[in-house]
Amino acid sequence: GTFPVVVGPGFGGVLFHEAVGHLLETTSVARKASVLADKLGEVVASPAVTYIDDGTLPHAWGSTEMDDEGRPTERTVLIEKGVLKSYMVDRPGPLLPGYPMTGSGRRQDYTFAPTSRMRNTCLAPGEARVEDLFAGIAFGLYAKEMGGGQVKPGSGEYNFAVQEGYIIRKGRLEEPVRGAMLVGKGPETLMRVVAVAQDLENAPGMCGSLSGAVPVEVGQPHVL
């Protein structure tokens, strides 16, 4: 069914990483294989959404001083208050007008050619209190812990298992649920974000793509 969902902090950010982050890599954008291609300066999310990729976070899994093409890493604001501000750009990226390099060229090892990749991505903290996210929900789902999932490249269509979830009734957590799945499209989900809490958490992991498996971090606060 369709009802409000509150996604927990930390590894909950894997949903945005997979369903949105990959759409903002110029590896996809340059081939027009992303539904977010050619949308710089456009509103692509709700005003509650600010999405950041930061290769400079101290001690984070995805941080290095230089990318695999010899450029310093940086903090890149990808989406700011709903507006698409930047892509993650590797060396071929500047061949496309208006795409400055962002130190995003990455690869697993010398057997792979670098491509644009995420490092440490997070949904920036908002102003809402966690309890306020639940308060107005008559019936919904709390996805406290996310599991694995699948994403269709280009469109951002996704389905993710909820590893630990609970029914929300009249703003209160009730019985646990098993077998719940979150299904949707990344760009549509961006537009439907209602509120973001203040309790940002990050979680480490590995990300696989054309240039192999690389260490990353995903992060977010509680999100409605």
Language model feature labels by segment:
Residues G1-L224:
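N-terminal small-residue-enriched
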